[in-house]
């Protein structure tokens, strides 16, 4: 797809280009001046227009984490990439580019409007995560297979579709097929779908659609089952006890244990293993249930903490708003009085009074903020102690339960070694009646060989138990450390933001007063 500006030098999407675009699209007049002085943070930008820039590659957008609308049409972009951090994006225009495949949209789960018209796309796919998609523009591409339409049935919110200008739109059954297979579509190729035509199309393809619905229903059931399974697994991971609600750990001990699996053929070992597994799984289930109960306690502790923090902040903000409201009421009266005052001495007195009021407000707001900082610091410290104690108790009790797993393994090892030695003695004496597989009998050449085999199996089992314990302890300790660290950092950022807000407000009041003073002196 050639366009007049394709011959121009491709541009790099760098910080300079982004800053210029943000500046041009930012607030104007007084708000714009303030924004230019302080700089606009990319994370605060909600809409970004980068059309007709001759951009070849999407890059450097990772800081626009709160972006809602992105316009990249009329460039020379060849691939959809670099958008993974724009998770809040709702509207995306990539029309009039050189894109050949739909890709790179997996994280844009909030996208509602997507335009990819006038590109080189030949297949509709890789849109599955866009569950909120309402408008899809794919006109003037190279889509030629009607089966692409069926793919779009998975988007329940899709109401507007454009495919005109594609080879598929030239097919005789084009509209009828779409009307039948996309029954919730309202607009096709910029025209409202005729309800009568939709009913005719539905009747024509009724049998095929019924079969398709049956297959989709089965797929939906499997999908929901898998989603429920994954949700449960995520909950178990949050409690650090995933895969402990069954024989998973026990089975993993034998999955890599070649010698242990051979030894299971020995007479009496089968019954021994069965009893061992039953007891081992019971302990794992105890760890699992205890882990879930402790996770609930940690959640309650965290929720209570967050409520306390928000209540304290809200109460402090309400006090600040009240102080500001009283100040503004008095300040406005003083400003009006100054404007109407003709006596210079009286004017200077009122200006001094205004300056003192501004200083007093600043001090009051800063005192309120310092009080809040102290209050939140105390609350955070109490929470840190509580959550650390909860985690410590959890680890202590889990380690006690895992020690029981080790005791079971040690007991099993002793019994297995006893059976193995007795079997060796029977084989050496020719008293072994049971047939053993050749690879198992090969272990019984002498005592050292069989003792080493039993010992190797035991070591593998202990290592699996140790690794699971380390995984749990490391996981919950890391979670606790990161949580506490984030809470402290969030409070520092909140304090800095609040102090900045106070200074900006006071500076604005002072600037307004200074401008008034200069104007009156000149007059």
From Swiss-Prot:
LRR repeats lie at residues 44-65, 66-87, 88-109, 110-131, 132-153. Signal peptide: none annotated. Keywords: Cell projection, Cilium, Coiled coil, Cytoplasm, Cytoskeleton, Flagellum, Leucine-rich repeat, Repeat. Residues 166-204 form the LRRCT domain. Residues 369-393 form a coiled coil. InterPro entries: Cilia_flagella_integrity, Leu-rich_rpt, Leu-rich_rpt_typical-subtyp, LRR_dom_sf. PROSITE patterns: LRR (PS51450). It holds the Pfam family LRR_9. The keyword Flavoprotein does not apply. It is found in: Cytoplasm, Cytoskeleton, Cilium axoneme; Cell projection, Cilium; Cytoplasm, Cytoskeleton, Flagellum axoneme; Cell projection, Cilium, Flagellum. GO terms for cellular component: axoneme; cilium; sperm flagellum. Component of the nexin-dynein regulatory complex (N-DRC) a key regulator of ciliary/flagellar motility which maintains the alignment and integrity of the distal axoneme and regulates microtubule sliding in motile axonemes. Belongs to the DRC3 family. Component of the nexin-dynein regulatory complex (N-DRC). Interacts with DRC1. Interacts with TCTE1/DRC5. Interacts with DRC7. This is Dynein regulatory complex subunit 3. It comes from Rattus norvegicus. The lineage of its organism: Eukaryota, Metazoa, Chordata, Craniata, Vertebrata. The gene is Drc3.
């Amino acid at each position: 797809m050639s366009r007049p500006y394709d011959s121009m030098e491709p541009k790099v999407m760098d910080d300079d280009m982004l800053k210029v675009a943000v500046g041009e699209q930012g607030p104007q007049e007084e708000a714009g001046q303030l924004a230019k002085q302080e700089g606009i943070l990319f994370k605060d930008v909600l809409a970004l227009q980068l059309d007709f820039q001759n951009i070849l590659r999407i890059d450097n957008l990772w800081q626009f984490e709160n972006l809602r609308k992105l316009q990249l049409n009329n460039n020379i972009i060849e691939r959809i990439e670099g958008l993974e951090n724009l998770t809040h994006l709702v509207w995306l225009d990539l029309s009039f580019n050189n894109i050949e495949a739909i890709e790179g949209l997996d994280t844009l789960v909030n996208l509602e409007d997507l335009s990819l018209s006038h590109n080189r796309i030949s297949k509709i796919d890789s849109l599955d995560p866009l569950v909120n998609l309402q408008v899809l523009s794919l006109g003037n591409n190279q889509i030629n297979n009607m089966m692409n339409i069926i793919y779009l049935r998975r988007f329940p919110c899709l109401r507007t579709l454009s495919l005109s200008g594609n080879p598929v739109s030239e097919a005789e059954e084009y509209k009828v097929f779409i009307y039948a297979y996309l029954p919730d579509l309202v607009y096709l190729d910029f025209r409202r779908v005729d309800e009568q035509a939709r009913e005719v199309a539905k009747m024509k393809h009724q049998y095929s659609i019924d079969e398709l619905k049956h297959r989709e229903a089965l797929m939906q059931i499997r999908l929901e089952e898998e989603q429920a399974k994954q949700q449960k697994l995520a909950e178990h991971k949050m409690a650090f006890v995933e895969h402990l609600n069954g024989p998973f750990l026990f089975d993993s001990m034998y999955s890599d244990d070649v010698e242990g699996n051979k030894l299971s053929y020995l007479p009496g070992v089968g019954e021994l293993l069965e009893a061992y597994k039953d007891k081992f799984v019971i302990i794992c289930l105890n760890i699992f249930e205890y882990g879930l109960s402790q996770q609930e306690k940690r959640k309650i502790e965290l929720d209570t903490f967050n409520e306390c923090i928000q209540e304290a902040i809200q109460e402090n903000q309400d006090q600040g708003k009240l102080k500001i409201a009283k100040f503004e009421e008095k300040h406005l009266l003083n400003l009006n009085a100054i404007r109407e005052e003709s006596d210079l001495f009286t004017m200077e007195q009122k200006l001094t009074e205004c300056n003192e009021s501004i200083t007093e407000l600043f001090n009051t707001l800063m005192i309120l903020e310092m009080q809040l900082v102290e209050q939140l610091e105390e609350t955070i410290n109490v929470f840190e102690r509580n959550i650390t104690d909860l985690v410590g108790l959890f680890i202590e009790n889990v380690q006690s339960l895992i020690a029981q797993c080790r005791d079971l393994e040690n007991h099993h090892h002793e019994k297995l070694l006893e059976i193995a030695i007795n079997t060796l003695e029977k084989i050496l004496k020719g008293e072994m009646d049971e047939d053993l597989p050749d690879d198992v009998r090969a272990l019984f050449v002498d005592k050292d060989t069989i003792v080493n085999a039993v010992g190797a199996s035991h070591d593998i089992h202990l290592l699996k138990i140790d690794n699971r314990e380390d995984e749990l302890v490391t996981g919950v300790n890391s979670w606790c450390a990161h949580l506490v660290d984030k809470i402290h950092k969030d409070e520092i950022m909140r304090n800095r933001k609040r102090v900045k807000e106070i200074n900006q407000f006071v500076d604005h009041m002072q600037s307004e007063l200074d401008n008034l003073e200069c104007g009156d002196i000149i007059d």
